[in-house]
Amino acid sequence: MTSPLTALSVNLNKIALIRNSRDTKYPSITKHAQMCIDAGADGITVHPRPDQRHIRVDDCFDLAEILQVELNIEGNPFAPPMKSNRKSVSDYPGFIELVKMIKPAQCTLVPDDQHQLTSDHGFDLTQSGDKLLPIIEDLQKLGIRVSLFMEPDIDQIRLAKQINTDRIELYTGPYATAYEEKEIHPEYFEKIFAQFYSSGEIAAELNLGLNAGHDLNLSNLKKFATIPNLLEVSIGHALTVDAIEYGLANAVRAYQKSLGN
């Protein structure tokens, strides 16, 4: 049975990518955020990378000013400042500096670099835990809830608890891939799903909030939403693709229905 408490946060990066492809002011990020909210989205997610190839610094400020729902800003906590070299685009101040200025409801720390097309792995806290601890503490002092992008590895999840993060966001790429092939390799799918399910159980035992995201779509979401302790899913690419076919409002409603909301 799906949980009625699983929030849907819509990632707007693909909307920004369409806008930036023509260097225009439309589609409007704030307008589309409001359309998502009016259709029932519980939150908005953005991932401003240093090169600002989709979401830009100014988008983050604009969204923070108008949103009446939670804003989740994702990014690499070690991303440094970068000049934009474009008159209409503000310089990137560094990820953590941007988050401290915006003060979103949630900040999701992700171990990607500026050359990655998309996020494709979680933190290895045996390597980065000591560096992340003071960052997490600084953000929490500002009233920002912190989530770490993680893989469904129980030992890593226990380490996440030790550095006092509020939540973890499970990287669901492997689940989505296994789901696509579940008719051909059902045993492999069940093995992968069991890893995610166990991760949800461990997170609950540790009193860690559980988020999830990456490649979730209308086909695979309902099954994933049976995982215990799932508080939020962040979905952008697939929802944007579905919006082309069904319309944005209908796409948001369809995802909420898949969550059982």
Q: Residues of each region from the PLM?
A:
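N-terminal small/glycine-rich loop or linker at the start of catalytic domains
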Residues: T2-R22, P111, L117-H121, L132-K141
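Catalytic cores of alpha/beta
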Residues: P80-M101, D153-I163, A212, L216-L230
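Hydrophobic faces of well-ordered beta-strands that scaffold small-molecule active sites
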Residues: T6-L12, I44-V46, V69-G75, A105-L109, ...
